[in-house]
C-alpha cells in the first residue's frame, strides 16, 4: 500500500452520490487522509455530516467558506489525488470549460496531481456528442476517465451510465498513487481480446475437472486496457463473484471448448490477444448423463482426451494469415520447478513452444498466483528480453503488462 496520501473526493449532484460514501470509507480505511468536496446539489442527496463522519475531516462546500484559509486554492494544491465520484455530465462540462464557480471546480483548476473521474448519468447524456467530446478532452489533458458501468439507472431506464463499483474506483485510485502520475491513454484505437478465469471440464452433471484460477489477473488486465482507451472484449470462465469491468464487452464460458470457440469468433477483429485464462489441457473422454453414484458401478479410472491448445492455435492462425489484424499475442504460464529445471526454464521452453510475442510467468506456491489479490513474476519476450514483475497488486501488475504491450506495439510502428 502507498504511504498515507491526501485525497480529495469530489461529489457531484447525482443519484449515485450516495455511493461516494463507500469510496470515502474505503480510501480512509486504506490509511489515507480524505477531504470530501461536494457540490451544493450533492448535499441534496447526502448530508455533509455523513461525509465528515466517514472521512474524519470537515466538509467545505463554498468558495466563501473560511476565506482566510484560501480553501478554494489550498485544497487542490495540497492534494496527491483528486477523485470525482460521481462525475455528472454537468461537472464534466464545467471541468472542460475551466469553470471555477464552486469549490469543487476551483479545486480541479488548482490541482497539480492525477485526477480520476468516475462518471454517472443517464445513457442519453453519456452518449451525447457534447459529453463524448468532453470526455475525450479531459483524457487528452491527462485526466483518467472511467467508463461507466451498464445496468439499471434511475426509474425504469437501463444502459451504460451507472457509477463504476466502489472497489474499481478505489483500486484505480490506489494505482494512481503508486504510479504518482496519470495513466496514459495509449491504447486508443486498439481492439483487445482478453481471456480470464479457469475452465471446467464436466465428469457428470455435478462434478468437473477444474483449476484454482480466480480470474482476478485477467480482469485487471482487461480493466487497465479499457481505462487506457482500448476496445476490450473479455472472455471469462467461471468467475462468479468478480465485478465486470466497466466499458468491457463480456462473454461468459464454462469449458475449454467453449473458450476456444469464443476466441475463434472474436480474434479476427482483435489487434491484441491476452490469454490470461487457465485452460484445461485435458477433458474427460466421456461425460456421464447422470450423477455417478458410489457403489459397484463407480469408475476406477477416468479416460482423458487432450483439449485444443487455444494459444498455440491463435499463433498458427496469425501465421497462416487468418488473423490479419492481430499485432500482439500474450500468453500466461503458471509454473512450478521440478527435477528438470526451475520456473524460468519451463517458461522459456513454453514461450518457444507456443510462439507468442510475450509470456507472463507466475511461480505457483502458497499465497502466490491463484486466489490472491497480489502477484509477481516475470515477463518474457520472443526477442529474448526478460524482466521481473515485482510483487504488487494484480492491478499494478496488469498496468506493467499493458505497459509492455504498448511498448511492443510501438516498436512495430518503428
UniProtKB/Swiss-Prot annotation:
Keyword Magnesium: yes
Cofactor note text: Binds 1 FMN per subunit.
Any one GO biological process: coenzyme A biosynthetic process
EC number(s) reported in the record: 4.1.1.36, 6.3.2.5
Start and end residues of each stretch annotated as Phosphopantothenoylcysteine decarboxylase: 1-191
Source organism superkingdom: Bacteria
Biological pathway: Cofactor biosynthesis; coenzyme A biosynthesis; CoA from (R)-pantothenate: step 2/5; Cofactor biosynthesis; coenzyme A biosynthesis; CoA from (R)-pantothenate: step 3/5
Gene Ontology MF terms in the entry: FMN binding; metal ion binding; phosphopantothenate--cysteine ligase activity; phosphopantothenoylcysteine decarboxylase activity
Region of interest called Phosphopantothenate--cysteine ligase, as start-end residue ranges on this chain: 192-414
Keywords associated with the record: Decarboxylase, Flavoprotein, FMN, Ligase, Lyase, Magnesium, Metal-binding, Multifunctional enzyme, Nucleotide-binding
Cofactor: Mg(2+); FMN
Assigned GO CC terms: phosphopantothenoylcysteine decarboxylase complex
Pfam families given in the database record: DFP, Flavoprotein
SUPFAM superfamilies per record: CoaB-like (SSF102645), Homo-oligomeric flavin-containing Cys decarboxylases, HFCD (SSF52507)
Protein activity control: Two related chemical scaffolds that potently inhibit the activity of the CoaB moiety of CoaBC through a cryptic allosteric site that sits in the dimer interface region of the CoaB enzyme were identified.
Reaction(s) this enzyme catalyzes, per UniProt: N-[(R)-4-phosphopantothenoyl]-L-cysteine + H(+) = (R)-4'-phosphopantetheine + CO2; (R)-4'-phosphopantothenate + L-cysteine + CTP = N-[(R)-4-phosphopantothenoyl]-L-cysteine + CMP + diphosphate + H(+)
Residues the record lists as binding CTP: 275-277, 281, 291, 293-294, 308-311, 332, 350, 354
Family, similarity comment: In the N-terminal section; belongs to the HFCD (homo-oligomeric flavin containing Cys decarboxylase) superfamily.
Role: Catalyzes two sequential steps in the biosynthesis of coenzyme A. In the first step cysteine is conjugated to 4'-phosphopantothenate to form 4-phosphopantothenoylcysteine. In the second step the latter compound is decarboxylated to form 4'-phosphopantotheine.
Subunit structure: Homododecamer.
Name the UniProt record assigns to this protein: Coenzyme A biosynthesis bifunctional protein CoaBC
